[in-house]
Amino acid sequence: MKIAVCIRQGLDGDISPFDACAYEEALKIQGAEVILVSMGAPSVSDLLLKLTRLGAARAILLSDKAFAGADTLATAYALSLAIQKISPDLVFCGRQTLVGDTAQTPVMLGQMLGYGLITNVMSIDRIGADTIECTTRCEGAEKATIPALITVERINTLRLPRLRSKLGVLEMWNAEDVGADLSRCGLKGSPTRVLKTFENQSGKRKCTFISRDKLEWAIEEGLKRSEEQAYAETENNGEKLLKVFTVTDAPMDFAKTVSDNVTDIGFAEAEKIAEKIKRDDPDAVIWGSDTCSKRLSSQVAVVLGLGLCADCTRLECENGELIMYRPALSGSIIAKIKSLTRPAMATVRTDSTNAHQKIIVAAGFGVKDKMDDVRSFADGLGAELCATRKLVDNGYAQYDSQVGLTGKTVSPPIYIAIGVSGAIHHIAGMQRSGTVIAINPDKDAPIFEYADYGIIDNF
């Protein structure tokens, strides 16, 4: 059994957290030959060599100036050439990186390879001679025919090297080594373009500090004005696209801000959706942010060779083209992006909030030792209980309750953040909430910059 594990170096110079989980899952499979594959600058070789001490026999680094500036489609193309050369039985990838945060590249890679695909894996249940069976976050039990590619959630902790562990073999491959078509590589082969980036100021509010006994009043005030809150934060400069498709009605509100002619074409197999897009030639195709939409959109992008912008929070029409805005680098910046291919395609941050759910209580790491009290408080309000990534990562809450860049997006009329520091990747998942109330003993906590009402107090 040969397993290739795709690795991306994070901004901190270490392995991306989701990729670390994918690597650990590969190392657990007895008798498997594990090969690390990455694309980047020559300096990434140091990280790969260090990681081979954990058990990988080989590490392969794709490094060439021709690969620089690649978007997800061009990255998947380069990786697919390396994977074809390695010819593994299985390919393991992390669900997404924290650099691009798109979750597109692994799915695109699987589509290009023609491999079986299982995404959002929570556990690997069985690997047979011809199939792999997994439990996934959204669909439950799934099976794929080998060769297959799986994407792994944050389900484990990567082991540490043993005292006398040995380094594996490092190979560096350039574009010529993998037989790359240079027109499909790097910036030249990327169908999306970042026009500019700027600091992410979205979601910031003017916080009014109140005493603890005013909490009930603040909730009532928030509920009164909840009907005035806009669902999508997209602005419209008056220009419109002639024809736009949505895949399901989830992104309809976003689509209507850039076109008066919007058609919901619904879910279907990737090839059938691609056929309809090619035949009807819309200006843009807008997808939701649910797991199925993210997977299908990436597959359709490969079939049609289209650019795909992920997790957009704002859309505009400019000179007859769709302009897309999305957070990047863990939400710290906003990128303004256009597609060089027609139609433009984007997934947008659709809402996971139950339509009848008026209040969400979010627990942060600051109340990790008071979860029973927080849960009772939420139950008393009839509220849904959610959590930050740090609380989930440390085992105090379930993943399906996580709000943020690597969790779900919510926008309830009332969002009460308790013990939440206000990390930008959490803000990305709740910034469209109606009224935000923050409770934190630290008066300088960033969460207060994104709250309407603040209570400086322990819970």
Show which residues each predicted segment covers.
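N-terminal glycine-rich FAD/FM-binding segment characteristic of electron-transfer flavoproteins
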Residues: 1-459
